[in-house]
Each structure stands twice: as structure tokens, then as C-alpha cells.
């Protein structure tokens, strides 16, 4: 960080011992260590924020570039459509014929959305009830 060697650190330690004395030197060293840690955390936080902002700016630039390409392609398509004119108006104002797919042309009777009670009655007809002994007027 400060590019200091061992001799510079030793000189700072000796000066601090002479100025502060042996009783206050450990407390001062602890305080200096805490401040250095806070400064390092602050600097690393700033570096992370700056790199995140740079990445976001790069993404914005890429997004703008892609948007310009899309706009250019859309402009070409619009020019082609305008150059060929209105196709439906040249046919007498009638809309183009619609095409139906086999799944879209299925009738309502063929769908699976029929209630179960009606679907069951449609699939298997019930046989007529056999006459019982109570219903018959036999002598």
C-alpha cells in the first residue's frame, strides 16, 4: 500500500516508542491498526462500487448498440413495406383469406372440455331397462 520496507517500519516503531512511551504504545498501535483496517475496507468498498458502475456502463453501451441495430433493421423493414405499397388495398380492400389449422377447425363436440356427465352419455348409450315383474300386468 505505502511501499514501506522493514527499516522504515522499524524507524517508525522506535520514534513512536520514544514519543509515546512504553505504557501508551500498545494502545496507540491498536488504534492505528483499527484505523488502517477501516481505511482498507473503505477503499475496497469504493473499488467494488466503481467496478460495478463500470460494468453497468458497459452493459448500457452494449444495450444501446443492440438497440441501434434493431432500430436500423426495423427501419429497413419499414422502407421495404412502404416501397411495396399496401398489399391489401391493391386487392380491392378485402382482407387476406384466413387459414385455419386442423386443431383450430375442430368442432365443439370434439373438444375435451365437455362435462364428464354428457361425455359419458355420448360415448356409451345406456341399454333400455328390462321390464320387471312389478311393472308387467301379467295374470
Curated annotation (Swiss-Prot):
Positions of transmembrane segments: 1-21
Primary localization: membrane
Membrane topology listed for this record: Single-pass membrane protein
Compartments it resides in: Cell inner membrane
Keywords associated with the record: Cell inner membrane, Cell membrane, Membrane, Protein transport, Translocation, Transmembrane, Transmembrane helix, Transport
Pfam families: TatA_B_E
Region (Disordered): 66-139
GO molecular function: protein transmembrane transporter activity
Listed GO CC annotations: TAT protein transport complex
Annotated disulfide bonds: none
BP-aspect Gene Ontology terms: protein transport by the Tat complex
Extent of Basic and acidic residues compositional bias: 66-86
Subunit (UniProt): The Tat system comprises two distinct complexes: a TatABC complex, containing multiple copies of TatA, TatB and TatC subunits, and a separate TatA complex, containing only TatA subunits. Substrates initially bind to the TatABC complex, which probably triggers association of the separate TatA complex to form the active translocon.
Role, per record: Part of the twin-arginine translocation (Tat) system that transports large folded proteins containing a characteristic twin-arginine motif in their signal peptide across membranes. Together with TatC, TatB is part of a receptor directly interacting with Tat signal peptides. TatB may form an oligomeric binding site that transiently accommodates folded Tat precursor proteins before their translocation.
Family: Belongs to the TatB family.
Family annotation (NCBIfam families): tatB
Name this polypeptide is given: Sec-independent protein translocase protein TatB
Species, as recorded: Chromohalobacter salexigens (strain ATCC BAA-138 / DSM 3043 / CIP 106854 / NCIMB 13768 / 1H11)
Taxonomy of the source species: Bacteria, Pseudomonadati, Pseudomonadota, Gammaproteobacteria, Oceanospirillales
Gene of this entry: tatB
